[in-house]
């Protein structure tokens, strides 16, 4: 497997001893001591990350900033925000927020999260806040992704999307213990209970979040659906931009190099009514 896949959250070929992850997570937990409402954001562009920090703080949560090694730590860290180098123990060439998200139970009682390319109206931020703060331990919230119309009945392709959401320690621990969490190829999870179950899971789509849908549908997990229409408007992604430009056309996406190439954060903020936070 391409080594870069490990940092994206991929159980197939995952080679890092779990003991090493647990040790690293103890440091992440120490970094969040006294933080009741952490909200994970991922630095790929300083202006976008700064605006995300302000949005999070506006609703009374604490920005917890991780970052892709290709971009590095944020230049702007607002007072009260927390920066964590989730890659410090591993030295991976690429790291996505999926990596720490899979192990949320190790370092936080409750962890909100969203994409690095997502901005929201203040009205939406308050709706998300209310959902997140209303979660009981053992439950989580995320955006369901059932795919296009042709996939609506292909149940094994359905997944939950980490576009925006929140997990609790109990939910994250349940997913890890049962081997059905956020990462790709959840059939390769070390806690998959037996070979028969592994064969069952191998029939499912490989992508991230399929394990979360499986956890809900087959393992009794509690997931509160976040309506996609809440967040579609401010999701600045290649999916919604026909003339999206890649740094390496046809190659691996590099959001840190492409987000400012394709979207003007000032214009997006204006459209969402949050220019006052720039």
Kindly label every feature range from the protein language model.
Residues 1-50:
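N-proximal low-complexity "stem/linker" segments adjacent to membrane-targeting elements
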Residues 39-42, 61-69:
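Short, hydrophobic beta-strand segments that form beta-sheet elements in well-ordered domains
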Residues 51-63:
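Short, acidic, metal-binding catalytic loop of nucleotide-sugar glycosyltransferases
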Residues 67-108:
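Active-site-proximal specificity loops/subdomain of glycosyltransferases
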Residues 109-119:
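Short beta-strand-to-loop acidic/aromatic patch adjacent to the donor-nucleotide binding site
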Residues 121, 125-203:
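Conserved catalytic core of nucleotide-sugar-dependent glycosyltransferases
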Residues 164, 173-258:
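Catalytic core and acceptor-binding pocket of nucleotide-sugar-dependent glycosyltransferases
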Residues 244-245, 249-278:
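Long, compositionally biased intrinsically disordered regions
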């Amino acid at each position: 497997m391409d080594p870069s896949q490990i940092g994206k959250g991929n159980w197939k070929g995952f080679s890092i001893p779990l003991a090493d992850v647990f040790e690293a997570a103890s440091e992440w937990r120490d970094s969040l001591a006294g933080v009741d409402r952490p909200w994970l954001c991922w630095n790929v562009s300083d202006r976008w990350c700064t605006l995300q920090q302000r949005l999070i703080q506006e609703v009374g949560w604490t920005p917890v900033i991780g970052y892709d090694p290709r971009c590095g730590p944020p230049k702007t860290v607002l007072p009260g925000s927390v920066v964590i180098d989730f890659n410090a123990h591993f030295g991976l060439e690429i790291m996505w927020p999926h990596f720490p998200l899979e192990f949320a139970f190790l370092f936080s009682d409750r962890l909100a999260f969203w994409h690095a390319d997502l901005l929201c109206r203040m009205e939406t931020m308050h709706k998300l806040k209310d959902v997140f703060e209303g979660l009981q331990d053992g439950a989580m919230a995320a955006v369901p992704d059932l795919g296009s119309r042709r996939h609506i009945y292909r149940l094994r392709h359905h997944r939950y999307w980490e576009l925006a959401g929140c997990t609790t320690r109990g939910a994250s621990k349940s997913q890890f213990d049962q081997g059905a969490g956020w990462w790709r190829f959840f059939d390769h999870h070390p806690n998959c209970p037996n070979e028969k179950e592994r064969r069952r899971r191998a029939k499912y789509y490989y992508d991230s979040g399929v394990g979360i849908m499986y956890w809900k549908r087959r393992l009794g997990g509690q997931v509160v659906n976040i309506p996609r229409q809440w967040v579609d408007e401010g999701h600045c992604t290649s999916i919604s931009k026909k003339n999206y430009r890649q740094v390496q056309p046809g190659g691996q996406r590099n959001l840190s190099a492409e987000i400012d190439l394709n979207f003007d954060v000032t214009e997006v903020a204006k459209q969402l009514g949050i220019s006052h936070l720039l």
